[in-house]
Swiss-Prot record:
HEAT repeats lie at residues 858-896, 900-938, 941-979, 982-1020. Keywords: Cytoplasm, Cytoskeleton, DNA damage, DNA repair, Nucleus, Repeat. PANTHER family: DNA REPAIR/TRANSCRIPTION PROTEIN MET18/MMS19, MMS19 NUCLEOTIDE EXCISION REPAIR PROTEIN HOMOLOG. Key component of the cytosolic iron-sulfur protein assembly (CIA) complex, a multiprotein complex that mediates the incorporation of iron-sulfur cluster into apoproteins specifically involved in DNA metabolism and genomic integrity. In the CIA complex, MMS19 acts as an adapter between early-acting CIA components and a subset of cellular target iron-sulfur proteins. It comes from Xenopus laevis. SUPFAM superfamilies: ARM repeat. This is MMS19 nucleotide excision repair protein homolog. Disulfide bonds: none annotated. GO terms for cellular component: cytoplasm; cytosolic [4Fe-4S] assembly targeting complex; MMXD complex; nucleus. Its main location: nucleus. GO terms for biological process: DNA repair; protein maturation.
Amino acid sequence: MAEAQTALWGLVEEFVVGEQDSKSAEVAAGVKDGVFTVLQVVESLGSCLANPEPRMRSKGVQLLSRVLLECYSRLTEKEVEVLVVFYENRLKDHHLITPHVLQGLMALSMCDVLPQGVAVSVLKSVFQEVHVQSLMQIDRHTVYMIITNFMKTREEELKNLGADFTYGFIQVMDGEKDPRNLLVAFYIVQDIVTKNYALGPFVEELFEVTSCYFPIDFTPPPSDPHGITREHLIMGLRAVLASTSRFAEFLLPLLIEKMDSEMQSAKLDSLQTLSACCTVYGQKELKEFLSGLWSSIRREVFQTASEKIEAEGLAALQALSACLSRSVLSPDAEDLLDSFLNNILQDCKHHLCEPDMKLVWPSAKLLQAAAGGSSRACWKVTANVLPLLLEQYNQHAQSSHRRTILEMTLGFLKLQSRWLDEEDENGLGNLKESLCSMVFSAVTDSSTQLHVVALKILTVLAMQQGFMASSDIDLVVDHLTRLILQKTDSESCMAAVEASGTLAKVHPSAFISRMLPQLCANLQTEPMDINLNESGVVPEHSIRQLCLEALAAVSTHQSILKETVPILLDYIRRAHNGEEETNVENVVSVCKSLHRVAVQCQLDSESLQFYHQTVLPCLLSLTVQAATQDSGTSSHILLRDDILTAMVPVISAACTHLKPELASKSTSQIVSLFLDGDISLLSENNFSSKFQPFQVNGPTELQNRLVSLLMAFICSLPRNVEIPHLRRLLQHLLSLSLSGCSLFAYSSASKCFAGLINKCPQGDLLDDILKVTAQRIDVGLVEEPSRTQAITLLVWVTKALVLRYHPLSGQLTDKMIGLLSDQQLGPSVANMFSLLVSDSPDILNKACHADIRIMFRQRFFTENVPKLVQGFNSANGDDKPNYLKALSHVLNTLPKQVLMPELPSLLSLLLEALSCPDKVVQLSTLICLEPLLQEAPETLKVHIDGLISKLLGLSCSPAMAVRITALKCILALTKLPLHMLLPYKQQVIRALAKPLDDKKRLVRKEAVETRCQWFLLGSPGS
């Protein structure tokens, strides 16, 4: 025991006299290990704490406080009691000691065994003995943390202090300037208010001590290590100011004053704070200030040039309206909402009669914001405004005026429809006839600019159940049909298609009886070739295409779906049978419509089941029939690359959201069809020969192409769906991938194989297949006839494994990098690096449930870019472009923040890529460089001369895309420091004269903007 005490004295002496700060950690470790107690530490400090020198006493208290910060959780209640008395006495000591006393008190404030009354005693001592704002920032922060800790654990005790606690804290905070401390102080004030601490007579003082920081004017220093932003302080202060209605009488005049100031940030902050306050205030708090608030908001919306301030002003007005709507009125009380809305109507309503004047839209926005506060506000405003707008529509004959009136009407009707659920009946009943008359008039007007807005209004009205009679709904559908089938205005047509898709969910029977027959008739009678208008120019959308888009758009209800899907499939069937002159583009359009229908069905299991069980067998039947019959008896149009490619997303979208039972059943049937020729799934089975899609060469060559449809189905299934006969299926796909069949067939087989490999569970099957695949690829790369097939399979398998982080992906990627030096395959392999790192539309994507690990691109970059750079450096001159192209493809898909750290090491290589004659390399490199140029001035400093020279040269490239992107890069350079650019200013301006006369408008546009920015370099205000 004596030995431990001696050791403790030694450590204390070394810390206090020897100035060895590390000894405090040794003392703390001794306390933790039970070698000595905290009270023994206090005893050993006796002579030190009684020393007449303040510096010596300070060192003693510092040692004790450091020990307590390490060991506070081990203290007993008795020890805490003794230490608190000790520290409270030390607060009366010399000011040098105060910071260390506060550190000790902070340690004690974190103890779980605080005796009753200690928190109150400590805070009273701090409030009385410490002049907080004379302390250093870190010591003031310690005081805030002591208060915070006690508020968390001793709330009821502190509340017993009454308003003295609030007054004490006001003294602590008064004059605080450091943003780190202010954040904590704001949180404390918010807790004081929201947890109902007594404010007593100090409400105004508490408000003043916080509101003096409003509005926040703080800009964090560059590279601020604390990460405190102006936004953090704004939100902290706003939470305080909006925490209680007791601040209202002081805050609202302040907000009005700041809204009327010239500072944009003050206006914005005031409006946002007002919106926050309205969630807490009631009519009583707002009553006196409503007139001033309305005047300020009105002025900002009427006069401001800032869209942000206008938006916040409108939001604040809506919040005021909502606040006034919430208050419960006594029978004899004034309805402030009513009088407030009357003022707004009085100031704004008359401007709606001037649709060509400047204030019409600000007035409409203000009225709509006020109406958006509640259903009561909405009915009040719309009841006053809509009759006026209806009257104005009839009084103005000019189309532009009428469009403005319609757009305002649309805004009010959208607001009104939001509150329908809260009302027993539609408040527009007395305006129904006038509204319908106006909208039907607009939708039949000769001016097409009215149609789009009128259709939106019709949609809002027709979506309100019971508002329009069935005869009116029929008329709406007739108008939609007419606009879809008209040949004059594509904008109206597309708006009608969009409106039809929305309304068909609510009124399916009207669309089935009135629109579908006309669409179907036009689909069948329109000539197969693309329609020409009277001037012989091809319109943007042929009638046939619009009919197809409309059929897809309205297929949002199961009853409509059962009508439209057979119509679309029948068109494909007629194309297959050669019943009329066939146009491939139209079949592709039908497939696009079927795909849209499938996507719309995905969230409704019943609709999806119908779609899946109808579309999948039909498409497979028709294509299998086409592939198994002679060209003399059947058209092969459905086996065209572009049509099969268009069918892939149709089948894929029908499979991604299937229920497990249906998915398993369909999988079994389709695998049996492709492996064994089992045609029981197919709706039509009059086939002249057996279906053998995996047989290579011979009469089954057309059948090989249908593997693309197998891919669409089987690679889109969720990963938990078991694939029967998977080993056998993979073996067949592997053989077909390396066979001498058509490019479309072996590419589809490779993609299907890769899609299955990506989802295949880890185990013997995957290991065996990958081993055989690697061997077959090696053999294929050696044999001349199959090299292209082998490299296609290699890239897809590599991608499948890269996505799932499979160990073999590295070996396969190395093989691809090695092939960049291959004289025959090098250029195509370089292009395939784009496929490795970019998203695939048909397989190996998230929609198809592929196994995709996060940040796979970053990992691929880290592992392989050094190898590409090394390969480039060692390659001969003819092969270098292949490495540059592969590198630019990889870099192009990475986020800027990943590329920036690597830019210094890669920049010289990227500049060399700009000199590569390959246009793909040039464009890819430029796209990669553009976002990086303004971010790395120090890196670019060395290369700026060569960079500008190369970019100016590329601005005259034969390829338009290269010219445009080069000009964008030259524009991006203007963000660099001025001293780097001024030496090149005249050279760039002269060189950009040529792109100004470019034959392409988009190039000229980019050149004008770029040259203007270079002209402005160095000018005042630039």
